[in-house]
From Swiss-Prot:
GO terms for MF: RNA polymerase II-specific DNA-binding transcription factor binding; transcription factor binding
ANK repeat residue intervals: 3-36, 37-69, 70-102, 103-135, 136-168, 169-201, 202-226
Protein name as it appears in the record: 26S proteasome non-ATPase regulatory subunit 10
Tissue: Tends to be up-regulated in cancer cells with RAS mutations, including lung cancers and adenocarconimas (at protein level).
Biological-process GO terms, alphabetical: apoptotic process; negative regulation of apoptotic process; negative regulation of DNA damage response, signal transduction by p53 class mediator; negative regulation of MAPK cascade; negative regulation of NF-kappaB transcription factor activity; negative regulation of release of cytochrome c from mitochondria; negative regulation of transcription by RNA polymerase II; positive regulation of cell growth
InterPro entries the record matches: Ank_repeat_dom-contain_49, Ankyrin_rpt, Ankyrin_rpt-contain_sf
Organism phylogeny: Eukaryota, Metazoa, Chordata, Craniata, Vertebrata
Gene Ontology CC annotation, any one: nucleus
Organism domain of life: Eukaryota
SUPFAM superfamilies (alphabetical): Ankyrin repeat
Segments of this protein annotated with the region Required for nuclear localization: 1-37
Region of interest (Interaction with RB1), residue spans: 1-71, 171-226
Interaction with RELA: annotated span: 39-226
């Protein structure tokens, strides 16, 4: 069938947005609402992925579990946050989705909101109690991702919710190292203005100023030292 992503018909219906057919199937056999497919995904995971809000709401009304993880550790909230499904994120949080759940990579939904530049979703997650300094398996935070990607508004949002600017990942890099390395000028200036250190060395014994390209290092040095 079209939209065949799963070995379970009910998951394919959820992914392709066929609400009436999905309702018929589930009302005939309630267990289908929570059955898992080859990826350990339920209909809820697939509806979140494709952004079918009505199907998500139908499944949530049935009381399906909101925190079940697929075989890569992704919850429905991870999927919805990464895919930019604002209304679905709101609905999942309203049903008690765990905002700091981690997947196999140690990532929370906020990590994906930050790297994909999902502003409204990041705010919803943070308002819902997301830890702004949660670290993935590389000890990187949402701030590392926003800085590397050059997501200026996301950095503003994270700063508003008191995210740290000086956490080091497994390579010893702070968000400022990454911003400098990727030539994210405005992002680097914002980080320094909010307390990011220009003196922290990474594992290669380099400071952010030493990885900065062009005239960025000088700009940042002047900001700090005058």
């Amino acid at each position: 069938m079209e939209g065949c992503v799963s070995n379970l018909m009910v998951c394919n219906l959820a992914y392709s947005g066929k609400l009436e057919e999905l309702k018929e199937s589930i009302l005939a056999d309630k267990s289908l609402a929570t059955r898992t497919d080859q990826d350990s995904r339920t209909a809820l995971h697939w509806a979140c992925s494709a952004g079918h809000t009505e199907i998500v709401e139908f499944l949530l009304q049935l009381g399906v579990p909101v925190n079940d993880k697929d075989d890569a550790g992704w919850s429905p909230l991870h999927i919805a946050a990464s895919a930019g499904r604002d209304e679905i994120v709101k609905a999942l949080l309203g049903k008690g989705a765990q905002v700091n759940a981690v997947n196999q990579n140690g990532c929370t939904p906020l990590h994906y909101a930050a790297s994909k530049n999902r502003h409204e979703i990041a705010v919803m997650l943070l308002e819902g109690g997301a830890n702004p300094d949660a670290k993935d398996h590389y000890e990187a935070t949402a701030m590392h991702r926003a800085a590397a990607k050059g997501n200026l508004k996301m950095i503003h949002i994270l700063l508003y919710y008191k995210a740290s600017t000086n956490i080091q990942d497994t390579e010893g890099n702070t968000p400022l190292h990454l911003a400098c390395d990727e030539e994210r000028v405005e992002e680097a200036k914002l980080l320094v203005s909010q307390g990011a250190s220009i003196y922290i060395e990474n594992k290669e014994e380099k400071t952010p100023l030493q990885v900065a390209k062009g005239g960025l290092g000088l700009i940042l040095k002047r900001m700090v030292e005058g």
